[in-house]
From Swiss-Prot:
InterPro entries: Archaeal_FAD_synthase, Cyt_trans-like, FAD_synth_RibL, Rossmann-like_a/b/a_fold. Its cofactor is a divalent metal cation. It holds the Pfam family CTP_transf_like. ATP binds at residues 14-15, 19-22, 100. Catalyzes the transfer of the AMP portion of ATP to flavin mononucleotide (FMN) to produce flavin adenine dinucleotide (FAD) coenzyme. It catalyses: FMN + ATP + H(+) = FAD + diphosphate. Keywords: ATP-binding, FAD, Flavoprotein, FMN, Nucleotide-binding, Nucleotidyltransferase, Transferase. This is FAD synthase. SUPFAM superfamilies: Nucleotidylyl transferase. GO terms for molecular function: ATP binding; FMN adenylyltransferase activity. HAMAP family: FAD_synth_arch (MF_02115). Belongs to the archaeal FAD synthase family. Pathway: Cofactor biosynthesis; FAD biosynthesis; FAD from FMN: step 1/1.
């Protein structure tokens, strides 16, 4: 008899202007398990990490993510750095990192192990045209087209 236990995958990110790169990332993350939960970065976290506020507030970013078929649930992260408490509550089997997220996989595994979680941490590769599938590049193109 097989187990009915679902494999839970968790990803996190800003997801400010959803683009094809995000969709490819979410699809690949979903393929790692049965259930995909997205932690969308809190507005304060975006300001701190990117040096600017997000274009869209966290509630709007979460709503857009919920509409993507690969996503089973979305939670808004707490202000500040990655919340180990939130991850502990979500009980992931796998955490999938994006190719441009600046977390060290082994360091994250150690931190998770220190709070009693044995989680597989995987860095996913770029699956789409990285010169186009980056929010910063989209903002640059919008600025070039509409602000000249």
């Amino acid at each position: 008899m097989g187990s009915d236990r679902k494999i839970r995958v968790v990803v996190g990110g800003v997801f400010d202007i959803i683009h094809a790169g995000h969709v490819h990332f979410l699809k690949m993350a979903k393929e790692l398990g049965d259930e995909l939960i997205v932690i969308v970065a809190h507005d304060e976290t975006v300001k701190k990490r990117k040096g600017r506020p997000p274009i869209n507030p966290a509630e709007d970013r979460a709503e857009v993510l919920k509409a993507i078929r690969y996503v089973d649930d979305v939670v808004i992260g707490k202000p500040g750095e990655i919340s180990l408490d939130l991850i502990k509550r979500l009980k992931p089997d796998v955490i999938a990192l994006g190719p441009d997220q600046d977390f060290d996989c082994e360091d994250l595994k150690r931190k998770l192990k220190s709070i009693g979680l044995n989680v597989e941490v995987i860095r996913l590769p770029y699956l789409y045209k990285k010169d186009r599938a980056k929010t910063s590049k989209i903002i640059e193109r919008i600025t070039e087209i509409f602000c000249d």
